[in-house]
């Protein structure tokens, strides 16, 4: 496919005012100004007609396909609220790719999502990075697992308080995480000793600890649900204790500790910003959080947390960050290349770079202008819009 005559936002360099994007065998083949456009192109050609051409949007944190749209309990598969520690739960076993919200995502230009379990459990389970086009989930997966979800703050407290079980305090929530990480470290060490010495007894198989092995081996990052500043600090404290790779998710009060987060080298997926202050830990929610974090030197992404904010409003969330002071280029990066980098999938998506997946969005105007319309969406070199 050849897409021509548009302002090309490559996200790996400056925009090209009148450019083209060529896709071959599902991958980005060539990008440049129209003067360099292949003259002998034989395949499908799409004229952007002076619009904007950019990589497919990436939602770095949502629950797409985990909470079925308008399905009630039958479609509610995001929280296994029967056990505070469920690292062995895999999003790929819960996502419904037939959920109509996948279509909503595609039509809005959101071509990649990181989706997975909610935040009822301190250790919630495994996220998946996947495309929004397709019917057979295994064919849509980019990376599984993509992250291990941890949760701090009000959600685990409320979940288990209502069940008259623990944890019901922030201390207990942190203790659940620490205890199971410590068990995983011990399990890892026993496996390594058994592998090195035939006389050492191999530990009995444990599905939960097996799932945590990539975490304590620094092969899989943890995504920490945390809104309040003290919960953010607790999450980082635990990760430093166990030497984990981590990303803060939501970080609602991150702007209050922006310099400290920069000092710690934290990465933050901010949002959702389109909603009310529905619980106490959202009291300091602000549209300025992304810009204040970015100004401090924190790498950010912007998410919808679908269904909290419908996934199709990801570009609007980025536009609202611009309203809060974030430069437009940074806001666009936060839903493309930065989101892909934080999500560990930048080798495949997030920019119009030669060799990456042919995921492209064509819009009638600037992508952060809410009046701009999506003209076409291409995933893996195939047009997926009607």
Regions found by a protein language model. Give the residues of each.
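Histidine-rich, glycine-flanked metal-binding segment
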Residues: 8, 12-54
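His/Asp/Glu-enriched, well-ordered alpha-helical/loop segment
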Residues: 69-70, 76-81, 86-88, 221, ...
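Polyanionic/metal-chelating signatures
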Residues: 101, 106-246
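Divalent metal-coordination and catalytic microenvironments
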Residues: 6, 21, 26, 50, ...
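C-terminal cap of metal-dependent C-N hydrolases
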Residues: 6-10, 341, 353-386
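A general structural motif
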Residues: 203-205, 224-228, 249-252, 278-287
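Active-site gating loops and adjacent loop-to-helix segments of metal-dependent hydrolytic enzymes
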Residues: 68-95, 133-136, 149-163, 201-202, ...
